[in-house]
């Protein structure tokens, strides 16, 4: 039975049992930055199981694309070494949301396996949780599985309810016992049943896990029964296919055999059992579908996991002797194998191949060199010693080798790696980066008081704020004198502290004769705002009360840019695709600078579309709304959360126009306050990362006015209205080309005339051969070459060398030898001989060569030496 048929029969079976077929969700979990990848079928139903979301159906079935690489669930290092580990796999599942429970789940599973897939009942074993008598009785009394093939598994992980047969979503929340179904391959395969000392063998293979969510676990570990228990089951397509296709390795099923053959074709390998081919076949599936879902290779988060998988595949290709790009050429084979089940793959296959090809080219530049470094280091490692952390770090930092890739190579050669040394090298680099950072005093100042109360969302001026701490050169003090630079901590402030890419506010702290100019605002600790600046007048003491006033003009420009950044982020995703993710940002009064994941330069048309979308939102003049709510409620409501950011239980959600993001920054009250949005630059900053800069409000107006003034000046110079400039510039270019052609013709005539003079005045005969060597003033090298060609034809057999010295002191040399003489005299040798005398070099073909030099004073003697040089060679 083919894998496609197994998948189809599974979905159709549960559809016949009243289940709704739900398409596979993205490998990027929707609005859940805490989870790296979708790694099981239940992920897209998580909020349904917890009661936070309601669906129109109570029974569902799906074939879910899943990835287990990176993060908590990571099978990457095992791929290629075992028969059943994959980075990408398909999870077949059926789900009940408060509808049926254990009895139906067990009966459905048994019916599908024995009646639809026709597996022999005597080959199936099951496990249940030690205390789950209900499931045991259903298997034994209703399904009829003999007691000797039902195994109770207790708490085998060191704690209550810590068992292979007890599932929990997290430390708290829904949980419950599970029942696993195993297939017995027979006594000819080594291994024992689950729970036995030999359970790690390959005889008994788990094919299906039925999870019964019947409890709610609180923080104290207490278990309460759920009023509406749920069912979550998962069966790996690759595993059940191996059973139904009568093979013992997932890599022997039809899904993999064609991909392995394709990998062999592209690497030139004949042995289809080579483990490296299995790695490549596995990795093309993971890489392609990650790109389908908008992830591109990068140096952080999900993008870095993708990069690690790609580079691991390339390394295995290199191991097989393939040093050229090959990985991207497997995409059509993957589409042929899986495109029907997942049409989204076929739709973006060209883009998938493009992204992979770019990553191959990027890593290919360093792979060979890095492997030489690693091979050399491994050759020096004494038996039993690890590869040192410094080499690990060098390969990572300089040659782009993910540390797990290096560890994988070392594992093949039975060498351990010094991870502690690697981490130490990483830490040293971080400390050096911090030491070179802009704000050395921004963090880590000793402070034990209350957090600063921020009131800058609504107020730019706040009276009666109290000084709670003062710092001079990093040391806490009680008083600051006029002229000193210091950091002031207040109990409350309207000043925004640098965070989330937005720069800190500037302004004044005043009281009586005291005046402190705030040059920047930074957090010295989480929740504690440090006002960095200079005391311009008076004396400032801890406990003093001040008036805090933010620079309103600067803040207004900053908030315009920050709000525009949100709109631009959304517009970029609309124009370029959902793979666009923030990689960094800087929002200051002058501009917004936004780094984002994308693998190609934006076209002028794409930039114009982004501008149009953002300015349409500006013109709509919609009110900006900020709400503080629970994090789970925020992401459920569609707020964009950034992967890798740390969020608390309570977050601030900003709605501005069509954008909804988690953001603690300051913003305009209405989109119309942005005024005008204009992109001023777009370029690359790193592999797979683009940077776009834009301006707003009065800055954008000033930019437009400057551009218009420049346009008007150009129109004045060309004596044409601005709207006719393209045509007028084209006319000028045509006129310039015509004049250049006329000039070239004039030079040719002049050169011909000069040639006539040279023939008459500078030609000598050496052993029956005409030799002409002369310096003719400032002549274009191209014209000089034409003259040499002309003179060769007129004088043959002949040797010709012409030199021209320009006003800037550069010498051009052209030498020519007629074809009948190149066996004895070569133009390249001649030009090299002369160029060497004038401080230069030269070379070329035997019949024509060019060179140059810089010593004008030596040129006459060098030219005069040609006659003797030729004579010596005849």
Curated annotation (Swiss-Prot):
Alphabetized GO MF terms: alanine-tRNA ligase activity; aminoacyl-tRNA deacylase activity; ATP binding; tRNA binding; zinc ion binding
Where is Zn(2+) annotated to bind?
562, 566, 663, 667
Q: Could you say which enzyme class this protein belongs to? A: ligase
* Localization per record: Cytoplasm
> Keywords assigned by UniProt?
Aminoacyl-tRNA synthetase, ATP-binding, Cytoplasm, Ligase, Metal-binding, Nucleotide-binding, Protein biosynthesis, RNA-binding, tRNA-binding, Zinc
Reactions it catalyzes? tRNA(Ala) + L-alanine + ATP = L-alanyl-tRNA(Ala) + AMP + diphosphate
Q: Which cofactor does it need?
A: Zn(2+)
User: Which Pfam families is this protein grouped with?
Assistant: DHHA1, tRNA-synt_2c, tRNA_SAD
Question: What family does this belong to?
Answer: Belongs to the class-II aminoacyl-tRNA synthetase family.
Domain note: Consists of three domains; the N-terminal catalytic domain, the editing domain and the C-terminal C-Ala domain. The editing domain removes incorrectly charged amino acids, while the C-Ala domain, along with tRNA(Ala), serves as a bridge to cooperatively bring together the editing and aminoacylation centers thus stimulating deacylation of misacylated tRNAs.
User: Could you tell me what this protein is called?
Assistant: Alanine--tRNA ligase
Q: What is the lineage of its organism?
A: Bacteria, Pseudomonadati, Pseudomonadota, Betaproteobacteria, Burkholderiales
Supply the gene name.
Answer: alaS
């Amino acid at each position: 039975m083919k894998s496609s048929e197994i998948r189809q029969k599974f979905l159709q079976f549960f559809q016949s049992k009243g289940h709704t077929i739900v398409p596979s969700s993205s490998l990027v979990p929707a609005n859940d930055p805490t989870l790296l990848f979708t790694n099981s079928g239940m992920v897209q139903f998580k909020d349904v199981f917890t009661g936070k979301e309601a669906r129109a159906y109570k029974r569902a079935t799906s074939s879910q694309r899943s990835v287990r690489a990176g993060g908590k669930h990571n099978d990457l290092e095992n791929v290629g070494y075992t028969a059943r580990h994959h980075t990408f796999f398909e999870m077949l599942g059926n789900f009940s949301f408060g509808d049926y429970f254990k009895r139906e789940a067990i009966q459905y599973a048994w019916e599908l396996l024995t009646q639809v897939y026709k597996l022999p009942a005597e080959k199936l074993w099951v496990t249940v949780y030690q205390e789950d008598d209900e499931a045991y009785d259903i298997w034994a009394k209703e399904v009829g599985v003999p007691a000797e093939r039902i195994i109770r598994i207790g708490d085998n992980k060191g704690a209550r309810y810590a068992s292979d047969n007890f599932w929990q979503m997290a430390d708290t929340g829904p949980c419950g016992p599970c029942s696993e179904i195993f297939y017995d391959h027979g006594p000819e395969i080594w291994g024992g049943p689950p729970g036995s000392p030999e359970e790690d063998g390959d005889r008994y293979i788990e094919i299906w896990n039925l999870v019964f969510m019947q409890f709610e676990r609180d923080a104290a570990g207490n278990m309460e029964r759920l009023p509406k228990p749920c069912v979550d089951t998962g069966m790996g397509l690759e595993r059940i296919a191996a059973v139904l296709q009568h093979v013992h390795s997932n890599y022997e099923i039809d899904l993999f055999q064609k991909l392995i053959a394709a990998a062999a074709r592209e690497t030139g390998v004949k042995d289809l059992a080579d483990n490296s081919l299995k790695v490549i076949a596995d990795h093309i599936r993971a890489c392609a579908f990650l790109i389908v879902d908008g992830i591109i290779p990068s140096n952080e988060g999900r993008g870095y996991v993708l990069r690690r998988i790609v580079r691991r595949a390339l390394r295995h290709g290199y191991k097989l002797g393939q040093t050229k790009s090959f990985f991207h050429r497997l995409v059509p084979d993957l589409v042929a194998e899986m495109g029907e089940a997942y049409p989204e793959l076929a739709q973006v296959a060209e883009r998938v191949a493009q992204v992979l090809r770019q990553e191959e080219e990027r890593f290919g530049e360093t792979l060979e060199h890095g492997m030489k470094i690693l091979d050399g280091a491994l050759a020096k490692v004494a038996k039993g010693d690890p590869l040192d952390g410094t080499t690990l770090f060098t390969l990572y930092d300089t040659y782009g080798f993910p540390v797990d890739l290096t560890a994988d190579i070392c594992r093949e050669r039975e060498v351990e790696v010094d991870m502690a040394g690697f981490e130490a090298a990483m830490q040293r680099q971080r400390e050096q980066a911090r030491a070179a950072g802009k704000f050395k005093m921004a963090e880590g100042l000793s402070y034990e008081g209350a957090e600063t109360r921020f009131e800058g969302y609504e107020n730019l001026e706040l009276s009666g704020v109290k000084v709670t701490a003062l710092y001079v050169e990093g040391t806490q003090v009680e008083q600051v004198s006029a002229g000193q630079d210091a950091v002031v901590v207040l109990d409350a402030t309207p000043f925004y502290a640098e965070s989330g890419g937005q720069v800190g506010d500037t302004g004044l702290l005043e009281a009586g004769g005291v005046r402190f100019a705030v040059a920047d605002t930074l957090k010295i600790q989480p929740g504690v705002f440090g006002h960095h600046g200079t005391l311009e007048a008076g004396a400032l003491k801890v406990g003093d009360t001040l008036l805090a006033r933010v620079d309103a003009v600067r803040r207004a420009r900053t908030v315009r840019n920050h709000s525009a950044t949100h709109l631009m982020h959304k517009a970029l995703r609309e124009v370029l695709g959902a793979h666009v993710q923030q990689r960094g940002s800087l929002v200051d009064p002058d501009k917004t600078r936004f780094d984002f994941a994308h693998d190609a330069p934006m076209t002028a048309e794409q930039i114009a579309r982004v501008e149009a979308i953002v300015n349409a939102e500006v013109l709509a003049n919609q009110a900006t709304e900020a709400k503080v709510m629970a994090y789970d409620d925020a992401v459920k409501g569609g707020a964009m959360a950034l992967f890798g950011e740390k969020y608390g239980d309570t977050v601030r959600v900003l709605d501005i126009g069509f954008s909804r993001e988690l953001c603690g920054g300051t913003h305009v009250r209405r989109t119309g306050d942005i005024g005008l949005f204009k992109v001023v630059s777009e370029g690359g900053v790193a592999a797979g990362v683009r940077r776009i800069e834009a301006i707003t409000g009065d800055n954008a107006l000033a930019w437009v006015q400057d551009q218009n003034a420049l346009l008007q000046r150009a129109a004045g110079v060309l004596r044409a209205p601005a709207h006719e400039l393209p045509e007028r510039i084209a006319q000028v270019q045509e006129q310039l080309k015509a004049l250049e052609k006329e000039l070239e013709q004039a030079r040719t005539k002049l050169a011909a005339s000069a040639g006539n003079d040279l023939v008459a005045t500078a030609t000598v005969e050496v052993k029956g051969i005409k030799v002409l060597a002369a310096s003719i003033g400032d002549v274009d090298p191209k014209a000089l070459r034409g003259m040499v060609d002309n003179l060769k034809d007129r004088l043959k057999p002949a040797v010709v060398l012409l030199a021209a010295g320009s006003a800037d002191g550069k010498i051009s040399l052209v030498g020519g030898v007629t074809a009948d003489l190149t066996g004895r005299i070569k133009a390249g040798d001649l030009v090299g001989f002369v160029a060497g005398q004038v401080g230069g070099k030269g070379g070329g073909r035997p019949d024509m060569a060019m060179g140059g030099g810089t010593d004008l004073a030596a040129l006459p003697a060098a030219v005069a030496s040609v006659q003797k040089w030729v004579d010596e060679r005849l």
